[in-house]
Every structure is written in C-alpha cells, then in structure tokens.
C-alpha cells in the first residue's frame, strides 16, 4: 500500500498504479494487498486503487468492491485482467492543473454510496 492513515478523520488505505494500455493485468496487484484492503474495509476503513492511464492521461479511483470483483473473476478462472471499457465512467478523475489529484472528492463519493 502506498498510503495507510487517516484523511480528515477517515481511515484510508490506497495503492497507486500506472497502466500504459487499456488492459490492466491483475498481476500488478498482489494477493496480500487484496487481503489487506478487505480487512481494512471490514474494520470500517476505505480502501481503493488509484490507476493512472498514461496514454489517456486519466486517473481512475477504483473502489475495493470493484477490484475485488475483478480479482474474484480471475481467481475463478476468468480474465486475469480488466479492460478500460469495464470501468465505471463516474470514477474517472479529471486532473486539475495537470497534476492535482482530487481524491478527497472520490473518498466522499465512495462513503456516500455506503450509507
């Protein structure tokens, strides 16, 4: 994990990834990371991946439940990757000023969907 801590009083853990192509191989996420994120979520925390698609110059906030869905599919013999077109468009972040990452807005959005 790239960050484990509290953001505005909310327990948060995330890992940042980079992808050049529109297909993200699940081998870029390790089993121990999925396990840790799951435990963190069960204890009331917010876990997610930030995936930067370099060719698109887009950043994607992937909620734990989404990465877990793709992970489980791979473990059950399905695709060991996910495609860009499988992502939920509402979780694509627009970079501000070319570098600012507005992840706090997406943490709040994630929390709002849990209530």
Q: Where are the language model's segments positioned?
A:
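Non-catalytic C-terminal interaction segments of nucleic acid-processing enzymes
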Residues: 1, 60-115
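Short acidic/glycine-rich loop or secondary-structure boundary segments that cap or lie
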Residues: 13, 22-25, 58-59
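Conserved catalytic cores of phosphodiester-cleaving nucleases, focusing on short active-site segments
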Residues: 3-21
């Amino acid at each position: 994990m790239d960050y484990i801590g509290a953001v505005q009083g909310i327990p948060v853990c995330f890992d940042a990834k980079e992808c050049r192509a529109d297909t993200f191989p699940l081998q870029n996420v390790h089993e121990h990371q999925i396990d840790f994120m799951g435990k963190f979520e069960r204890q009331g925390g917010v876990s997610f991946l930030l995936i930067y698609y370099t060719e698109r110059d887009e950043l994607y906030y992937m909620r734990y439940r989404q990465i877990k869905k793709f992970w489980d599919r791979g473990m059950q013999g399905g695709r060991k990757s996910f495609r860009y077109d499988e992502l939920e468009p509402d979780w694509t972040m627009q970079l501000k000023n070319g570098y600012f990452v507005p992840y706090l807005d997406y943490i709040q959005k994630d929390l709002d969907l849990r209530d």
